[in-house]
Amino acid sequence: EGTYVAASESGHHSRPDLNAIQHAMSWWDRVEAIFEPDEWVPVFEQVTTKPVDIEGGVSVDGLSMESTMEFQLRVPPERTPDEVRELSDAELEIGTVNWTESIPPVMTNPRTELARVFRAAIRAGGGDPRLLRKTGTSDMNVFATEWNCEMVSYGPGDSSLDHTPNEHLPLNAFDNAIDVLIDVCERCGVDDAATSADGETTPDTEAAQ
């Protein structure tokens, strides 16, 4: 993630010079051109670009035109955040980019013992496990750099509904996901994985799509 910031001298809108807002748009066009989507390459293996907020206009003192644009660049495992930042910064003509701390891409081996246990538990619950290369970030992106252990990102529901107005999870799918997680813990030898002191089932799960 990053924030592009630029300023230009204020003047009549009929002037041919580019103002700060136009500089922001021009820079973003060049960044998108660098990482132009390739229909022959899976989305997971490409850098994806997305502006998420833009503001601009005459400054409070009226002496300059200002623009601020927040954006996100998703980095595939084959590239590094530093490489993507360097390429984006190279396209700057006016303005600066303030980068936030990057979240590194992660891709795990689907043939680990933990992945096998998850597939078995899903099938035991009547489900059909599918291996996906998730394009969005999850907690695993952070934990993978700190924990030296096998990891799996699992969630029930229709992932195409993520972050949409119709995002939802049927209650039966939620209940089944809890059963899957309990089964996984039992297969991994975790005792009382989802049982509190009074015997009530209290799973700590996130109903993620």
Could you describe each region identified by the protein language model?
Residues 1-209:
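Metal-dependent amide/peptide-bond hydrolase catalytic core
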